[in-house]
């Protein structure tokens, strides 16, 4: 019995010692694990880090956690990402190659067509196929804050080059389109309200007679949000849009003509959803093929290059306050005149962030080159 009691006592001591050692080991491992766990990154610092990363990295980092996914997908982060300037993001040039010329917003497309959206960085050797979309038109494409609005067969879609996702808007149920007439048009305009942080698409449908002796127009607005739908906006001044529009400081502007070809600029306040009209430059025709509508110095401007091939002279009409126009002249140097050959027709494709006007040949030529024109030089 004494031996058994001694053995039992020794066993109890060993058991207690083992439990103490086990507890000490758990505490030691807990301290090591706590030391290895990284401290939580402050939200401001996390946003600052993420906004400096390439878009492809952001798409991968959405899988890190639900917090990161919701943050990267939020409108707040998108706005921060757009305002950050970093050399890691070289400017990209997008072009759309369409295999059916007649598939655009002014004609009903009866044949399927496909296009390839290509993008290139500053290196001419770098060309990347971004997206293949059935019938993605190249003429009626509007870029706004990193989003691209494109139109195919009178249907508008929004493409995000960062996520490579495309959303098609529902068709506009217009009374004008229901009428069987060859003299009608449909144009979409893309706007952004910085106060309410909203994107809106405006659709203007017009029915007109020869020489514009009679014009009827309807106007529709679509808010880009879940469950969005087209809403008709009343405006008692019938007009025919003649150019794609642009959005400046929460206002959409576009060139148009009214009864008897009176050239005007139509403005649409994205937030209040109200239209107004401004008399266009008297010496410029809104129907001229050598006229572009661009943003210049944060203001709408008419780019008239009718005499560019003959004299090297370009007139720039800038819309100032109170609806007045100021005229500026751009002159090509003699050594640059060979770039605007008489056999090549150019189209104005917009402006860069540095204020350079983009001129591209209307048809595919070899070599195919794009002109960047400023008030000081042409590249």
Curated annotation (Swiss-Prot):
Superkingdom: Eukaryota
PROSITE patterns in UniProt: FBOX
Pfam families: F-box (PF00646), FBA_3 (PF08268)
Signal peptide interval: none
InterPro entries recorded: F-box-assoc_dom_typ3 (IPR013187), F-box-assoc_interact_dom (IPR017451), F-box-like_dom_sf (IPR036047), F-box_dom (IPR001810)
CDD domains: F-box_AtFBW1-like
Ranges where the F-box domain occurs: 35-84
NCBIfam families in the cross-refs: F_box_assoc_1
Protein name: Putative F-box protein At5g62660
Origin organism lineage: Eukaryota, Viridiplantae, Streptophyta, Embryophyta, Tracheophyta
């Amino acid at each position: 019995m004494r031996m058994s009691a001694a053995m039992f006592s020794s066993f109890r001591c060993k058991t207690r010692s083992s439990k103490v050692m086990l507890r000490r080991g758990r505490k030691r491992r807990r301290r090591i694990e706590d030391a290895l766990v990284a401290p939580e990154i402050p939200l401001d610092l996390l946003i600052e880090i993420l906004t400096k990363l390439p878009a492809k990295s952001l798409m991968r980092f959405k899988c890190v956690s639900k917090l990161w996914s919701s943050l990267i997908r939020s409108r707040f982060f998108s706005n921060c990402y757009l305002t950050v300037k970093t050399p890691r993001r070289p400017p990209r040039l997008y072009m759309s190659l369409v295999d059916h010329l007649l598939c655009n917003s002014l004609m009903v497309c009866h044949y399927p067509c496909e296009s390839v959206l290509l993008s290139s960085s500053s290196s001419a050797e770098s060309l990347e196929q971004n997206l293949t979309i059935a019938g993605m038109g190249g003429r009626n494409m509007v870029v706004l804050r990193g989003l691209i609005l494109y139109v195919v067969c009178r249907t508008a879609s929004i493409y995000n080059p960062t996520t490579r996702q495309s959303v098609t808007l529902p068709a506009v149920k217009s009374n004008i389109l229901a009428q069987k007439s060859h003299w009608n048009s449909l144009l979409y305009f893309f706007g952004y309200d910085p106060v309410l942080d909203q994107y809106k698409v405006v659709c203007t449908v017009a029915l007109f007679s020869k020489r514009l002796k009679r014009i009827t127009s309807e106007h529709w607005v679509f808010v880009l949000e879940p469950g969005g739908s087209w809403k008709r906006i009343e405006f008692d001044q019938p007009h025919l849009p003649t150019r794609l529009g642009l959005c400046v400081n929460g206002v959409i502007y576009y060139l148009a003509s009214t009864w008897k070809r009176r050239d005007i600029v139509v403005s649409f306040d994205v937030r209040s959803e109200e239209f107004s009209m401004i008399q266009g430059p008297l010496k410029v025709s809104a129907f001229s093929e050598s006229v572009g509508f661009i943003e210049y110095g944060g203001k709408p401007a008419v780019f008239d290059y009718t005499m560019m091939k003959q004299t090297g002279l370009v007139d720039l009409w800038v819309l100032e306050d109170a609806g007045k126009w100021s005229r500026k002249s751009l002159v090509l140097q003699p050594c640059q005149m060979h770039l605007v050959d008489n056999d090549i027709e150019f189209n104005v494709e917009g402006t860069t962030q540095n204020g350079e006007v983009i001129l591209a040949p209307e048809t595919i030529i070899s070599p195919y080159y794009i002109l960047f024109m400023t008030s000081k030089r042409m590249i």
